C-alpha cells in the first residue's frame, strides 16, 4: 500500500498524495532484475509496483481492496503481460502466486508495505479518517464487521484492551467507558461523532502533534482488518514461496508491526531451539540471512519532502537454501482479542 505512516499521518503532510515511502531503499534491498518475478503484497496506489516494473521485473500485485485493484487496471494495460493484479488478502500471497504461476512456483522477491493507504484515508466514505465525516467503517474490503460494529457491540473491557494494545492509547479505559455510556443512548455511526467524543473526553493540548482520536482510530482499523494476524501469516507465506537468494522487504510505520518483523527475522536466523528456562533440543538451520543491517529509516530529505515517511522502518532478509521453519504464530506475541467473526454474529 502507499502507506500513510505514523500516528500523525492525517495531521501532517496532507498535501502529499500516494507517495511511495522509502522507494529508493526498497528497490536497493529488493534488487529486482529483468525477468525476475516480484510479489507486491500490498499494491495500494501501485507506487512500489511501478518502480519494480520499470526495472524490467514482472510483478504479481495483491490487494484486498477492490477499489485499488480496479484503479490498477490502467497500469496493467501499460505493462502488458508483466503485471498481474490479484484481489486477495496478502496473508494468502502464496495462494495468489500458485493461482497466477502454478503450484510450487517460487518467486524472486516479496515486498510488503504495512498500513492503510493514502487512497483509503482520502476517501471519507471509507470511514478511516477522523478529520472527515463518513460512516464508521474502516474495512479494507467489503466483508466482515465494521468499526461501528466493534464500537457498539464489544464489551467495555475488550474495547479497552484493543485501544491499549493495538493503539497504545494511555486513556484506553476512560475512552472505552465513555463509549459504553454514550452508545447506550445513541450508537456511534459516523467518524466525526466518535472523534469529537474522544476529543471532548481527553482534551487537546495545542502543542500536541496528533489528534486525541488518532490511536483509537488506529486500533479499530487494525482490529477490524486483523492487520497483525495478516502480517504474521504473510511473513510465513513469503518464507514458503521465495527462491533461495530471494528477498523479503517489509516497510512498517508503527512499533507493533516493526517488533513483529524484527522478531520474525531474528527467529528465522536459526540457532538452537529452547530458552534459558528449557534445555536446547536441536539446532535450527536459518531460513533467512540479513539483507540490511537492522532497520533502515528515511533520509532527512525524504522526511522534509514527505512527513508521512518519518516513522517508516524497513527490514529485509535473504532466503537461504534451507527449508522453511515451522509455522508458529506464537512467535509474534499476538494478544488474545475477540474474534471479529464472533462480533459479526452478535
UniProtKB/Swiss-Prot annotation:
Keyword terms: Cytoplasm, Methyltransferase, rRNA processing, S-adenosyl-L-methionine, Transferase
Binding sites annotated in the UniProt record for S-adenosyl-L-methionine: 46-48, 63, 90, 113, 120
Signal sequence interval, chain numbering: none
MF GO annotations: rRNA (cytosine-N4-)-methyltransferase activity
An example Gene Ontology biological process: rRNA base methylation
Hydrolase listed as a keyword: no
Subcellular localization(s) per the UniProt record: Cytoplasm
Physiological role: Specifically methylates the N4 position of cytidine in position 1402 (C1402) of 16S rRNA.
PANTHER family, per the entry: 12S RRNA N4-METHYLCYTIDINE METHYLTRANSFERASE, S-ADENOSYL-METHYLTRANSFERASE MRAW
Family to which this protein belongs: Belongs to the methyltransferase superfamily. RsmH family.
Entry protein name: Ribosomal RNA small subunit methyltransferase H
Organism (species): Brucella suis (strain ATCC 23445 / NCTC 10510)
Amino acid at each position: 500500500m502507499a502507506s500513510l505512516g505514523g500516528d500523525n499521518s492525517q495531521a501532517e503532510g496532507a498535501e502529499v498524495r500516494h507517495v511511495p515511502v522509502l522507494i529508493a531503499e526498497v528497490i536497493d534491498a529488493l534488487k529486482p532484475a529483468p525477468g525476475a518475478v516480484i510479489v507486491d503484497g500490498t499494491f495500494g496506489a501501485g507506487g512500489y509496483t511501478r518502480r519494480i516494473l520499470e526495472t524490467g521485473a514482472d510483478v504479481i500485485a495483491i490487494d484486498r481492496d477492490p477499489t485499488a485493484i480496479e484503479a490498477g487496471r490502467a497500469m496493467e494495460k501499460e505493462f502488458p503481460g508483466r503485471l498481474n493484479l490479484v484481489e486477495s488478502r496478502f496473508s494468502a500471497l502464496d495462494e495468489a502466486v500458485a493461482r497466477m504461476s502454478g503450484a510450487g512456483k517460487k518467486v524472486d522477491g516479496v515486498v510488503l508495505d504495512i498500513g492503510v493507504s493514502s487512497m483509503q484515508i482520502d476517501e471519507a466514505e471509507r470511514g478511516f479518517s477522523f478529520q472527515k465525516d463518513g460512516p464508521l467503517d474502516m474495512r479494507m474490503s467489503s466483508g466482515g464487521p465494521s468499526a461501528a460494529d466493534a464500537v457498539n457491540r464489544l464489551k467495555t473491557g475488550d474495547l479497552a484492551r484493543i485501544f491499549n494494545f493495538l493503539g497504545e492509547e494511555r486513556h484506553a479505559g476512560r475512552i472505552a467507558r465513555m463509549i459504553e455510556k454514550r452508545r447506550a443512548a445513541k450508537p456511534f455511526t459516523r467518524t466525526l461523532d466518535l472523534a469529537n467524543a474522544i476529543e471532548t473526553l481527553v482534551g487537546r493540548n495545542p502543542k500536541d502533534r496528533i489528534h486525541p482520536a488518532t490511536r483509537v482510530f488506529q486500533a479499530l482499523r487494525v482490529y477490524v482488518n486483523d492487520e497483525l494476524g495478516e502480517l504474521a501469516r504473510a511473513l510465513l507465506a513469503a518464507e514458503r514461496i521465495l527462491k533461495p537468494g530471494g528477498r523479503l522487504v517489509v516497510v512498517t510505520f508503527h512499533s507493533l508491526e516493526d517488533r513483529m518483523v524484527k522478531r520474525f527475522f531474528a527467529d528465522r536466523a536459526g540457532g538452537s531451539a529452547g530458552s534459558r528456562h528449557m534445555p536446547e533440543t536441536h539446532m535450527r538451520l536459518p531460513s533467512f540471512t540479513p539483507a540490511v543491517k537492522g532497520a533502515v529509516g528515511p533520509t532527512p530529505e525524504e522526511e522534509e519532502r514527505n512527513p508521512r515517511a518519518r516513522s517508516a522502518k524497513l527490514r529485509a532478509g535473504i532466503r537461504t537454501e534451507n527449508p522453511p521453519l515451522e509455522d508458529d504464530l506464537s512467535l509474534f506475541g499476538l494478544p488474545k482479542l475477540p474474534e471479529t467473526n464472533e462480533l459479526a454474529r452478535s
